[in-house]
Structure formats: structure tokens, C-alpha cells
Amino acid sequence: MTLKASEGESGGSMHTALSDLYLEHLLQKRSRPEAVSHPLNTVTEDMYTNGSPAPGSPAQVKGQEVRKVRLIQFEKVTEEPMGITLKLNEKQSCTVARILHGGMIHRQGSLHVGDEILEINGTNVTNHSVDQLQKAMKETKGMISLKVIPNQQSRLPALQMFMRAQFDYDPKKDNLIPCKEAGLKFATGDIIQIINKDDSNWWQGRVEGSSKESAGLIPSPELQEWRVASVAQSAPSEAPSCSPFGKKKKYKDKYLAKHSSIFDQLDVVSYEEVVRLPAFKRKTLVLIGASGVGRSHIKNALLSQNPEKFVYPVPYTTRPPRKSEEDGKEYHFISTEEMTRNISANEFLEFGSYQGNMFGTKFETVHQIHKQDKIAILDIEPQTLKIVRTAELSPFIVFIAPTDQGTQTEALQQLQKDSEAIRSQYAHYFDLSLVNNGVDETLKKLQEAFDQACSSPQWVPVSWVY
């Protein structure tokens, strides 16, 4: 068994199924007619700096460069920002540095990045600072006239890229952003449509589903990863164990260390590229939470109430069977030699040792549940999320947090602390977070969310499709 879904038979078939589903979705979207809008701004006939009429676009006249100039006029009657930033180029000419998607200028289509501005309302911009020009354009109302030299570089097609945010971001708290007002605030898990990424440090994006149509600046993945890596931090403490097999032991450490190079890029998270798929069935329900938060009660309730839908994979152990235990029912009993051999062959999804005995869950056991068209329930350590979050297992990952009600005992405070440690490190993997104020309430919310996820369009990692 390998970690990549595409390398195994089961993983390959699931990868292909999701790829076909995505292709069908794209074809259906492409067949729909697209709306066309016409901006209401007024653009005059082209003029030339030497005063000549349009002569069929000569490049030079008498050895002098002919620069094509356009007069752009539009009315600004509100306090709405124009949605552009300016800069001085190497010739100290005022040029358009950035156009925010959805802003006034973007909607009009009157300016483009790189356009050189010569005059604003008849005033030459020479010898004016960028701050002065930005302020003048912001405060001006009524009819605005701009004399510009268009950027002759070819226009790139609009991006069609969506990213899932893996961190919280507030531009007002960011000292690196060039313009805090132009920043886009978002939270972990938000889907961001990337509009422009010409700037290597600051991309433009818009939160999907937001009522705000205009785009804002977000740190690029490179900038965010550099920022996080540059912050001096003390060595991170080990995440609290939430495994039913107890704390991870040397066998598991060895196993995870063997594959750590595969996931090195996940140590510093920023964004994850995603695609939107039509509804499809999630094959695995993963419960994550600190030890003692109540995951076992939730899991057992799901199994008892929905035996035809959910199945818990029977784990393997080297512990000798007790008198009342039947092989293959509570556990699969195998020798230490066989389990060690299976571990070396990467057949275990997760494993550990407890009181001198080894316990673990095999990939094949989960696959057999899927072949029965049932949903496998896993309660695993958060470190294992990197392994199970594949198209092969198609998991729906639910984080169970401790109650925020009742008396704050010392035990509850410790549980909340352990829970927050898991959340802070692994929240970008979660599809759903629930506070366990009661098993019945939590169970109802979980099942509703799971059914909704399986019956609605879903954002999934692009690696599940391509």
C-alpha cells in the first residue's frame, strides 16, 4: 500500500472517478452562454502627442517616437474608492501599479496595469508624488478626465484559480501590506478566488460567496511562507494524543519519520489549490479531537444508530486474545513478527504500542468497507491526517472540541488547552468543527453536515482530481 492514491488500484479508480466528474462539470459550465456587459464610461478618439491625426499607427515621425494618448472620462458621484494604486516607474512617470478586481476602474475597463497617466482633470502629474496623486483621485468628485498612454503589452486572460486559506489573515494587523485598506480579510477554510498574481508578493483575491464583489490584496504563498519561517519560534511541543491506541510510540515515530520528506512542504501552510466538484459521496468519516473529548461516544452512537451506513475498521493487535474475544470481531490477532513485516510494507494507516502490545489499522480494512458501499469511521491522531486526506479515502474530517458550558474544572481546562493545541496546528484540514455540548446534539449536527457534504457541490484539493 502506498500513500499516493494514484499508485494503487483502488486509489487510481477513485482518482479517475473524481477527474471524470470534474471534466463533466467543466463541459456543462462551458456550454452555458456567458453574459456580456458594456461599461458606461466614455473614451474619445485616439490622439497623438505630436498633434497628428491617426495616420495608420506609424511607429515614429522624423525620428521621434509617436506615443498614442487616450482621453478617458467618467463620472464619480460617490465616496467609492476608484480601486487603483499608482507608482512612479524608472522614468519617474506616473503609472497604474494595480487595479483591484471589482472596483470602479475594473468594472469600467478604462485603465490597465502599466498605463501611464499624463494628466488628471487637466493638471499635469509631473513633479507630484504618488501620495499626492492618490489623494487627488480619491477626493475628486463629478466628471473626471484622465489623459493616459496605454500600456501596449498584451493583456493576459483572467485567472480561474481557487485557493483554500490555511491561515487567518487581517490586513489591518499586517505591517508588510502596501495598503491596509486594499487588503482582504479572511479566515482558515475560506475559499478565495485568485484574480491576479502578477505581483510576486501580493496577489488579488475575492472570498467566494462574499457579498463584496471587489477584490483585495492577499499575501502570496511565497510571502506568507517566508513570513512564518522568518518568525523566531521556540520548538513546538508535541501535539496531544487522541489515538485509541494511546500515545504514539517508537514504531509509529519510525513510520512517520520514513515519510516525513513527502510532507515537508506542509509544515509551513499558506493556501491549498482547490476545485469545485458536483456532489459525490465521501467514503470516510474522520473524527479528530483531544483524548477525553467524547469521540468514542459519538463514534459508538453513529455505529449503533446507522449500522447499514457506518462501519468501524477492526484493528490489528499483537495482544493475545481473551477468552470472550473472537478473532476478526473486536480485533484481528496476529504475531509481532507479522505485524512488524506489515508495518515495513506500509500496510498500516496508523499504529502504535500500548502496554507492550502493538495495535494498528490497515488500509486494506478500510478499503473492504468502501467496497461494501459503506462509510468507514476513523478516530485517528491528527498527525495521520496528512496520510488519509487523499482521493483514495475521500475523507470528511470533523474536529470535536470540548464543551464551553458548565463549571470550568481543572480537567476541563486541560482538555480545552489540549484541544486548542490540535486546532491551532491542524485546523486547515478540518471540514467541520463541532463543540461537544452533548452527544445527541453533536450527533445530529454531524450527520446533517455529512449528508449535506455528500449531496452538495464540494471544494476538494486539486490533487484529488489531477
Curated annotation (Swiss-Prot):
Residues 282-451 form the Guanylate kinase-like domain. Keywords: Acetylation, Cell membrane, Cell projection, Lipoprotein, Membrane, Palmitate, Phosphoprotein, SH3 domain, Transferase. GO terms for cellular component: centriolar satellite; cortical cytoskeleton; plasma membrane; stereocilium. The keyword Transferase applies. CDD domains: GMPK, PDZ_MPP1-like, SH3_MPP1. Residues 71-152 form the PDZ domain. InterPro entries: GK/Ca_channel_bsu, Guanylate_kin-like_dom, Guanylate_kinase_CS, MAGUK, MPP1_SH3, P-loop_NTPase, PDZ, PDZ_sf. Residues 158-228 form the SH3 domain. Residues 268-466 are annotated as: Interaction with PALS1. The modification Phosphothreonine is found at T49. This is 55 kDa erythrocyte membrane protein. The gene is MPP1.
